[in-house]
C-alpha cells in the first residue's frame, strides 16, 4: 500500500482538488486524511468541518479514536479537519515531553495501514509541523505545479522540505512526481511553463506526470455539491484526466 502526501508551499494550485478527486478515482480502498486547517477537503466531501466534534486534531491529541473519527462515504473514507488543527503547535509546546512532534500522524495511522490500498494526505500550503507530520507518515509525495510564471520556484521550496524530512526522519520517502495543474489551453504561457518544467525537473531526476490537469471552472464549483468533481461531471474532459492520473499512480513502481 502507499501513503501519498499531496504537498505544495502555495495555495490555489489545485492541491485539495487533486487530493479529493484522486481519492475517488483510485482503485481499491482509499482513505483521505485532511491535514489542512482550512477544511476544504472536508467541505468537498459534504461535511461542515466547523460542526465536527471528532477530527484529525482530536485523533492526534488522543481525544478521539480512528473508528469514531473516520467518515465513510461512497467515494472514499476520510478523516476531516477544521481550524482546531491550527492549535497543534501550542499543544506540542505544552506537552513536548510526552509527544513526538513529527511522528504524531504516523503513530496515529500505523495500525490502520493494512485496511487500505491508498492513503491520500491533503497537506496545508506550508512546510510547517503539519506538513512535516504528513511527510513522515508518507511513502510518496505528489506535488501539484500550477502552469504559470514562476511556479517552479514554489515547487523547489517543498522539494527542499521533502529532502530534509527524508534525511532526518523518513529515509524511504520518495517524490512520486509532479502533476501539472490548472493548465489554461487559451494561453501560450501554460504550454511554455509546462515545457520548461519538464526540462528542469528531468535534470533533477524528478518525474513530471504525463497527465496534465486542465483549468476547469466547473471543478472549482464542485465543492458546493459535497461530492468529488469527478462524481458530478462524469463525462467532462477533466474527469478523464483525473482517471488517467490515477492510472499512472497505480502503475508507479
Model features per residue range: what roles?
Residues 1-253:
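P-loop NTP-binding core
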Amino acid at each position: 500500500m502507499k501513503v501519498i502526501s499531496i504537498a505544495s508551499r502555495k495555495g490555489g494550485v489545485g492541491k485539495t482538488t487533486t487530493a479529493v478527486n484522486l481519492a475517488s478515482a483510485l482503485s481499491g480502498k482509499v482513505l483521505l486524511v485532511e491535514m489542512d486547517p482550512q477544511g476544504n477537503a472536508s467541505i468537498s466531501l459534504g461535511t461542515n468541518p466547523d460542526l465536527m466534534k471528532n477530527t484529525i486534531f482530536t485523533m492526534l491529541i488522543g481525544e478521539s479514536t480512528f473508528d469514531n473519527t473516520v467518515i465513510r462515504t461512497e467515494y472514499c473514507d476520510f478523516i476531516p479537519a477544521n481550524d482546531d488543527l491550527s492549535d497543534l503547535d501550542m499543544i506540542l509546546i505544552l506537552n513536548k515531553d510526552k509527544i513526538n512532534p513529527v511522528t504524531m500522524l504516523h503513530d496515529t495511522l500505523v495500525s490502520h495501514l493494512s485496511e487500505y490500498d491508498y492513503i491520500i494526505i491533503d497537506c496545508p500550503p506550508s512546510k510547517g509541523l503539519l506538513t512535516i507530520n504528513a511527510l513522515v507518515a508518507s511513502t510518496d509525495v505528489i506535488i501539484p505545479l500550477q502552469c504559470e510564471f514562476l511556479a517552479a520556484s514554489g515547487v523547489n521550496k517543498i522539494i527542499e522540505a521533502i529532502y530534509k524530512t527524508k534525511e532526518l526522519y523518513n529515509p524511504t520517502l520518495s517524490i512520486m512526481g509532479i502533476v501539472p495543474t490548472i493548465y489554461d489551453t487559451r494561453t501560450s504561457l501554460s504550454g511554455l511553463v509546462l515545457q520548461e518544467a519538464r526540462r528542469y525537473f528531468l535534470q533533477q531526476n524528478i518525474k513530471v506526470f504525463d497527465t496534465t490537469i486542465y483549468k476547469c471552472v466547473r471543478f472549482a464549483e464542485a465543492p458546493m455539491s459535497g461530492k468529488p468533481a469527478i462524481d458530478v461531471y462524469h463525462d467532462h474532459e477533466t474527469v478523464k484526466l483525473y482517471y488517467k492520473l490515477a492510472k499512472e499512480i497505480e502503475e508507479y513502481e
